[in-house]
């Protein structure tokens, strides 16, 4: 038999032969085993002595042993249990039939709508769009929220962050964006949320309409690996539709809990904790996910909104700081504005869209800049105005701001069901600033 044919037959034999090992050591977020040599990223499973199974992903590969992090919890596993190699890398189902469905990061449907009929399995970890293959962001992406469309205009293929403390209104705003945008496909990743918030988000924020949506869900009680890869799985679904030439809205809530999942994994692997206990891998994970969004030449686009939970409303939080450095804009929600009854509570002075000036007309740019200037003057002199120390006529520009204060505040307030077209937002701005 020729040497080449023998080599091929041997390769086929070893590919088809099951590879077994055994558990040597079990820790809270990592299991060590030996018996074969998998690569980092391979998927394995434990066959427990009680007959149940636990699937995991290899995160440590050494000469004598390997370590993997479980997707589900490992109660009942013990040293000596059999470990079986399953496949190289994690894949996730994609296809148009995912629209209207809710899945977990293992690709299992959790919506009681029957078996999922998918087109193919796509790799969960892919490389971001090459820099020179990225299309220029030159089209407006309207979201139906007038304070964003008018003052923080988004572009098709832009990546933005929504930064806020807990209970300020991130989910409500994300629901408004999802319903108000004109993108034909919406992919939503709910990572680390409380279980009760999932049906609430579907019924209250999406109004029960999932016809153009795909939801990937990993709740707070799921393992760190589920919470980590839930975001990557959702991005793979968005990339599938982008590669079909479609414009996709990608919504993720929240980046902070995604990073916290990697913090748990990294600390279990012995990484040194740095700022606020986050290991280096937690910060380096953010661009790996976020840079996969964008606009690609001769294909579609992924316009992404990532919510960032700011602990104690501290915008210098390491995750918030890292996210701001990667994203093309940031929308900051203010707890103070909620106290004044302004919803959505967007702090337009602390927020920015880095592409806005390039995608709207010069007249629209002038309107947005003038509104922000007048609003900034009001905030700067708010105390003087309140106590009556400012005399009208001392500053012409501040006089104009005071006269238009009620109209400007009215512009920033919007009922969550009163979404409006992009052109209407600028018409209202022009009327205020006449």
From Swiss-Prot:
<dbReference type="InterPro" id="IPR000194">
    <property type="entry name" value="ATPase_F1/V1/A1_a/bsu_nucl-bd"/>
</dbReference>
<dbReference type="InterPro" id="IPR005714">
    <property type="entry name" value="ATPase_T3SS_FliI/YscN"/>
</dbReference>
<dbReference type="Pfam" id="PF00006">
    <property type="entry name" value="ATP-synt_ab"/>
</dbReference>
<keyword id="KW-1006">Bacterial flagellum protein export</keyword>
<dbReference type="InterPro" id="IPR003593">
    <property type="entry name" value="AAA+_ATPase"/>
</dbReference>
<keyword id="KW-0067">ATP-binding</keyword>
<keyword id="KW-1278">Translocase</keyword>
<comment type="function">
    <text>Probable catalytic subunit of a protein translocase for flagellum-specific export, or a proton translocase involved in local circuits at the flagellum.</text>
</comment>
<keyword id="KW-0406">Ion transport</keyword>
<dbReference type="GO" id="GO:0005524">
    <property type="term" value="F:ATP binding"/>
</dbReference>
<keyword id="KW-0375">Hydrogen ion transport</keyword>
<dbReference type="GO" id="GO:0030254">
    <property type="term" value="P:protein secretion by the type III secretion system"/>
</dbReference>
<dbReference type="InterPro" id="IPR020003">
    <property type="entry name" value="ATPase_a/bsu_AS"/>
</dbReference>
<keyword id="KW-0813">Transport</keyword>
<dbReference type="Pfam" id="PF18269">
    <property type="entry name" value="T3SS_ATPase_C"/>
</dbReference>
<dbReference type="InterPro" id="IPR040627">
    <property type="entry name" value="T3SS_ATPase_C"/>
</dbReference>
<dbReference type="GO" id="GO:0016887">
    <property type="term" value="F:ATP hydrolysis activity"/>
</dbReference>
<feature type="binding site">
    <location>
        <begin position="164"/>
        <end position="171"/>
    </location>
    <ligand>
        <name>ATP</name>
    </ligand>
</feature>
<dbReference type="InterPro" id="IPR050053">
    <property type="entry name" value="ATPase_alpha/beta_chains"/>
</dbReference>
<protein>
    <recommendedName>
        <fullName>Flagellum-specific ATP synthase</fullName>
        <ecNumber>7.1.2.2</ecNumber>
    </recommendedName>
</protein>
<keyword id="KW-0066">ATP synthesis</keyword>
<dbReference type="InterPro" id="IPR027417">
    <property type="entry name" value="P-loop_NTPase"/>
</dbReference>
<keyword id="KW-0653">Protein transport</keyword>
<dbReference type="GO" id="GO:0030257">
    <property type="term" value="C:type III protein secretion system complex"/>
</dbReference>
<keyword id="KW-1005">Bacterial flagellum biogenesis</keyword>
<comment type="similarity">
    <text>Belongs to the ATPase alpha/beta chains family.</text>
</comment>
<keyword id="KW-0547">Nucleotide-binding</keyword>
<dbReference type="GO" id="GO:0044781">
    <property type="term" value="P:bacterial-type flagellum organization"/>
</dbReference>
<keyword id="KW-0963">Cytoplasm</keyword>
<dbReference type="GO" id="GO:0005737">
    <property type="term" value="C:cytoplasm"/>
</dbReference>
<dbReference type="GO" id="GO:0046933">
    <property type="term" value="F:proton-transporting ATP synthase activity, rotational mechanism"/>
</dbReference>
